[in-house]
């Protein structure tokens, strides 16, 4: 007869078994899987988990950094939400098969990333967009010589910053490192050897090169070509403008050039491609009511050229308003039509009568109801009232953006079709804590605004404001992002010249007696997908080119 096992013996055995199991540790069920299976599993993880996986081992670091994983994350975070937003604005629906597609050429406004032979670092691209969405960047500065008169002109195009002033001529700088001067050409190569001041600058991006046009105070303008591959800046030709006074504004869309002189003469020119100096004036018009600030725009199609001039004027009812004149030319320079509109109706909250002839619209003092059922009286008081002229304006079709001294911006949507030209709605944009000195907007609705003190730069996505146009629904500060350089306080000290980059050929000393506090002025040189460049006058005789890098 067998003896019964004691209960104490059984408990001891179970305890030893648990200890053995605990010494083995958790079972690793992932390392034995193939890379294909692991990539499929990682594709379901959020960004925070992918970042953790990169710190586990070399294998997981390589797998979690796979470009296709980040490409899908990029699409989910940035591409698809924008497509949904635009579909709701246009009152359309997305196709049923609008899920992720590996073909970047099918993504909205991402064709530049699908160029032949171009390999995109999707993790870096995701980081770039993430930094833009949070305003995170690094700030670097380049100090320029004492401010000449007129001040330095600057433009950003295809990763190159072009500056123009009377002392140093036309210079090209690398946007990645603005302290590096790529090329330089003095203005004395023109027919007049005397020093003249540049008053306007325009740049157009060509295949493998950039075309630069500089306008001067004597009404002349010079043409230059910058070869991207060799970084050679070459003077091409000098021409006399249509006006007798200084060139005040220019817009270029090669091979066409639009310019305005100080005597309010608007002229359109055709620039012959190649190394020849032939420039033909296509049209010239005299303007009587153009008041600064103003902006020019030039668009081309297969059949016509559309030149647009936006200017400010005072309206007795709603204060300072904007006038928009659109001129249509054929390729030979024949004027096809001229159309004029303003922002007055939008400032009153009136929707345009698009179904009536333009002559009938001017005779009507009432406005048809949006549903077409009845007529509504024109409001007595405007919803948008500006007592002071705009401090700056920017127009990139269809977006028109102005800045004001009352800490606000105003956005308009310009609609131009074969039958009509009108402004759809107007929306005040809030978020700045001081007067806004300058704005720039792209045709995709991305905008940069700079406060008058220079320490507040905000990023706007104006596509999000389209649904609120013409309504009382505000577009608040939460809809914009303030740029916050990570290294501004720790690396940069405006009072310490030793902490600023300075080009070698621009070494100079500033008299300490002149260093006193003055209101800073700034000019937004431009921005692209990776950076914002700002030209700022900090103190007397001190000009800084600031580069805000989001990479």
Model-flagged regions — what are they?
Residues 396-410, 437-462, 466-467:
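Loop/turn-rich, solvent-exposed surfaces of beta-rich toroidal or solenoidal domains
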Residues 198, 380, 387-390, 515-524:
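Signature of short aromatic-glycine-proline-rich micro-motifs recurring in repeat-based ectodomains
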Residues 2-31, 48, 55, 59-191, ...:
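Intrinsically disordered, low-complexity acidic/Ser/Thr/Pro-rich linker and tail segments
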Residues 170, 221, 266, 409, ...:
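Structural signal for beta-propeller blades
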Residues 522-551:
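Blade-level signature of beta-propeller repeat domains, shared across WD40, Kelch, NHL, RCC1
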Residues 67, 96-107, 111-339:
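Fungal eukaryote-biased detector of long internal structured cores
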Residues 314-317, 407, 454-456, 539-541:
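Short glycine/acidic-enriched loop and turn motifs that connect beta-strands
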Residues 56, 157, 166, 208, ...:
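Short loop/turn segments that connect beta-strands within the blades of beta-propeller domains
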């Amino acid at each position: 007869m067998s003896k019964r096992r004691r209960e104490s013996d059984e408990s001891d055995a179970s305890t030893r078994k648990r200890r053995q199991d605990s010494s083995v540790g958790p079972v690793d069920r992932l390392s034995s899987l193939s890379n294909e299976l692991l990539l499929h599993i990682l594709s379901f993880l959020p960004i925070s988990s992918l970042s953790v996986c990169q710190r586990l081992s070399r294998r997981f670091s390589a797998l979690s950094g796979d470009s296709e994983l980040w490409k899908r994350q990029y699409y989910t975070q940035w591409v698809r939400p924008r497509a949904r937003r635009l579909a709701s604005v246009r009152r359309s629906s997305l196709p049923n098969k609008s899920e992720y597609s590996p073909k970047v050429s099918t993504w909205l406004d991402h064709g530049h990333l699908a160029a032949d032979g171009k390999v995109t670092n999707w993790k870096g691209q995701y980081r770039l967009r993430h930094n833009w969405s949070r305003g995170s960047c690094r700030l670097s500065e380049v100090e320029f010589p004492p401010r000449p008169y007129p001040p330095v002109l600057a433009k950003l195009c295809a990763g190159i910053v072009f500056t123009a002033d009377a002392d140093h001529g036309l210079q090209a700088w690398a946007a990645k490192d603005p302290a590096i001067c790529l090329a330089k050409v003095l203005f004395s190569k023109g027919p007049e050897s005397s020093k003249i001041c540049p008053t306007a600058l325009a740049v157009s991006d060509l295949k493998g090169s950039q075309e630069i046009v500089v306008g001067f105070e004597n009404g002349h303008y010079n043409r230059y070509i910058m070869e991207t591959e060799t970084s050679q800046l070459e003077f091409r030709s000098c021409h006399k403008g249509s006006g007798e006074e200084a060139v005040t504004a220019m817009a270029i869309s090669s091979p066409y050039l639009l310019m305005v002189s100080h005597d309010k003469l608007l002229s359109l020119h055709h620039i012959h491609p190649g190394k020849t100096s032939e420039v033909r004036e296509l049209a010239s018009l005299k303007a009587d009511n153009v008041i600064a600030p103003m902006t020019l725009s030039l668009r081309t199609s297969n059949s016509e050229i559309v030149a647009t001039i936006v200017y400010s004027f005072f309206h007795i009812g709603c204060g300072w308003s904007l006038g928009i004149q659109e001129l249509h030319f054929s390729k030979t320079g024949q004027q096809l039509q001229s159309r004029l509109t303003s922002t007055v109706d939008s400032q009153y909250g009136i929707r345009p009568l698009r179904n009536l002839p333009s002559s009938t619209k001017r005779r009507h003092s009432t406005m048809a109801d949006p549903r077409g059922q009845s007529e509504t009286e024109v409001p007595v008081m405007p919803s948008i009232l500006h007592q002071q002229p705009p401090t700056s304006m920017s127009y990139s079709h269809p977006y028109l953006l102005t800045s004001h001294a009352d800490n606000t911006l105003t956005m308009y949507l310009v609609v131009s079709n074969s039958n009509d030209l009108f402004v759809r709605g107007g929306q005040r944009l809030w978020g700045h804590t001081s007067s806004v000195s300058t704005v720039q907007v792209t045709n995709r609705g991305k905008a940069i605004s700079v406060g008058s003190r220079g320490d507040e730069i905000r990023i706007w996505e104006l596509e999000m404001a389209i649904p609120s146009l013409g309504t009382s629904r505000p577009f608040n500060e939460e809809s914009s992002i303030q740029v916050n350089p990570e290294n501004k306080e720790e690396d940069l000290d405006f009072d310490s010249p030793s902490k600023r980059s300075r080009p070698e050929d621009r070494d100079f000393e500033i008299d300490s007696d002149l260093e006193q506090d003055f209101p800073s002025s700034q000019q937004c040189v431009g921005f692209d997908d990776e950076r914002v460049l700002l030209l700022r006058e900090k103190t007397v005789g001190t000009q800084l080119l600031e580069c805000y890098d989001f990479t």
